[in-house]
């Protein structure tokens, strides 16, 4: 299949369309504005719906409603905009409504800046809206990987009835890369496969079988039963949907943990360190929830590994999960920046060299 040079944000939008998304609700915010811009042109071409909402709060609640009919729905925003969506995201999770949410992370906290960041890891993986819920959360490291993950995102969302979150730093959205676009999925809502969906009532239907999309349970026992069902589903996701990349880990003296674009920079550092005679590996979570604890532990706790370096474009958020995975078996160091200052290859090389010298 031929390669096409595409900007990340536009490629992500096109992949969603090819995966069957026919409803986009969003609001412009840098650095993801090209996603709604692209959708505004493409959705009418394929008979879909593009709606620029009056706010992020309105957009996520439109997602809630449209996804409740069984349609494949998507919204996108960036850090402070995603913060505004958190109430609606919790509603979608509580009602078990499948949808795809894109967060093109930018610098923070507050309004921060419009450059790339990985500062929303806690929000996407640990926090967000209220209640005990999770989102299946992907952290792509390239435009092609974002496309490939999008092509499975709706299938996963519908299998488990869980919203899917993409944590894509601003560089992924703004860079251009040659990509291979998949064929268009012929998706139609099948009420037999989605008995929970509100697909409308017609004369002759059994009123007792009406669809109700709901996240409120006034009765305590009913809420407890619902939460037990959610937790059972999350355990199934943890058991089946962990994704990661292990790179050059066999025989490594040091292991780097990183996600997203930072992991690509780490690979450049690994190549330079190899020229200096130092064997360094990389473990990159592709799903940051569920986090691949066992895979990280296996790579980092090899007998020959002297220490682990976690590198992030924040002040050390995934670091907590890395430490939980390793559980004190190896020393874990951290290197990172916030304020959208991307860690460089030279900085990572220098950090590994200082660790080797015992500094």
Explain the meaning of each model-derived region:
Residues 116-169:
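Conserved thiamine diphosphate
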Residues 7-11, 232-254, 267:
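Glycine-/acidic-rich phosphate or pyrophosphate-binding loops and their flanking alpha/beta elements
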């Amino acid at each position: 299949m031929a390669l096409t040079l595409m900007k990340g944000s536009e490629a992500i939008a096109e992949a969603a369309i090819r995966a069957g998304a026919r409803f986009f609700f969003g609001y412009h915010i840098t650095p993801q504005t090209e996603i709604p811009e692209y959708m505004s042109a493409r959705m009418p071409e394929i008979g879909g719906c593009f709606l620029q909402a009056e706010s992020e709060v309105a957009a996520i609640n439109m997602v809630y409603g449209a996804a409740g009919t069984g349609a494949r729905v998507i919204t996108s925003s960036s850090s402070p905009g995603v913060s505004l969506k958190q109430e609606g995201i919790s509603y979608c999770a509580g009602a078990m409504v499948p949808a795809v949410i894109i967060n093109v992370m930018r610098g923070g906290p507050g309004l921060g800046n419009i450059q790339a960041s990985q500062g929303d890891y806690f929000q996407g993986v640990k926090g967000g809206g209220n209640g005990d819920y999770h989102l299946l959360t992907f952290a792509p490291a390239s435009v092609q990987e974002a496309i490939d993950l999008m092509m499975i995102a709706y299938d996963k969302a519908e299998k488990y009835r869980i919203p899917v979150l993409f944590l894509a730093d601003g560089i992924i959205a703004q860079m251009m890369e040659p990509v291979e676009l998949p064929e268009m999925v012929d998706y139609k809502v099948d009420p037999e496969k989605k008995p929970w969906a509100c697909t409308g009532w017609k004369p002759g239907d059994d009123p007792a079988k009406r669809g109700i999309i709901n996240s409120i349970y006034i009765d305590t026992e009913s809420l407890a039963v619902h939460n037990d069902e959610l937790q059972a589903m999350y355990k199934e996701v943890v058991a089946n949907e962990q994704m990661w990349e292990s790179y050059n880990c066999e025989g490594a003296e040091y292991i780097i943990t990183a996600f997203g674009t930072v992991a690509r920079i780490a690979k450049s550092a690994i190549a330079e360190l190899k020229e200096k005679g130092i064997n360094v590996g990389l473990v990159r979570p592709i799903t940051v929830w569920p986090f691949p604890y066992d895979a990280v532990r296996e790579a980092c706790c090899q007998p020959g590994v002297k220490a682990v370096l976690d590198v992030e474009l924040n002040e050390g958020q995934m670091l907590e999960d890395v430490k939980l995975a390793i559980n004190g078996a190896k020393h874990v160091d951290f290197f990172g920046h916030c304020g959208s200052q991307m860690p460089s290859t030279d900085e990572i090389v220098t950090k590994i060299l200082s660790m080797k010298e015992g500094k």
